[in-house]
């Protein structure tokens, strides 16, 4: 895994999301003080999940076609999406957020 610096904790208030411009682009969410990172592109359509509708039960609804995903597992919870989103481990260290990304393949 390749650990990257995402942002300070203060940049993602509770109930909000932040787009992290890395490769791949990540959507970072704060749900009740817990942070979740998923692929920012909906698996059904070309929509940014960081612009989606965050629910208290750690799910996010795509802003384009209302597909819903679990932030913990990436599982698609309703149609029209059927494919999951990739999730990434998140670590908070000293007020900063880091995300583990897979190593780039040669």
UniProtKB/Swiss-Prot annotation:
Alphabetically ordered keywords of this record: 2Fe-2S, Aromatic hydrocarbons catabolism, Electron transport, Iron, Iron-sulfur, Metal-binding, Transport
Q: Which Gene3D superfamilies match?
A: Rieske [2Fe-2S] iron-sulphur domain (2.102.10.10)
Pathway given for this chain reads:
Aromatic compound metabolism; 3-phenylpropanoate degradation
Q: Give the matching SUPFAM superfamilies.
A: ISP domain
Query: Entry's PROSITE patterns?
Result: RIESKE (PS51296)
Report the co-factor binding details: Binds 1 [2Fe-2S] cluster per subunit.
Give the protein's cofactors: [2Fe-2S] cluster
Domain of life here? Bacteria
Rieske domain sequence ranges? 4-99
Alphabetized GO MF terms: 2 iron, 2 sulfur cluster binding; 3-phenylpropionate dioxygenase activity; metal ion binding
Tell me which Pfam families the record gives.
Answer: Rieske (PF00355)
Provide one Gene Ontology biological process annotation. 3-phenylpropionate catabolic process
Residues engaged in binding [2Fe-2S] cluster: 42, 44, 62, 65
| Annotated function | Part of the multicomponent 3-phenylpropionate dioxygenase, that converts 3-phenylpropionic acid (PP) and cinnamic acid (CI) into 3-phenylpropionate-dihydrodiol (PP-dihydrodiol) and cinnamic acid-dihydrodiol (CI-dihydrodiol), respectively. This protein seems to be a 2Fe-2S ferredoxin.
Q: Which HAMAP family match?
A: HcaC
The record's subunit annotation is: This dioxygenase system consists of four proteins: the two subunits of the hydroxylase component (HcaE and HcaF), a ferredoxin (HcaC) and a ferredoxin reductase (HcaD).
Membership in a protein family: Belongs to the bacterial ring-hydroxylating dioxygenase ferredoxin component family.
This one is known as: 3-phenylpropionate/cinnamic acid dioxygenase ferredoxin subunit
Q: What's the source species' lineage?
A: Bacteria, Pseudomonadati, Pseudomonadota, Gammaproteobacteria, Enterobacterales
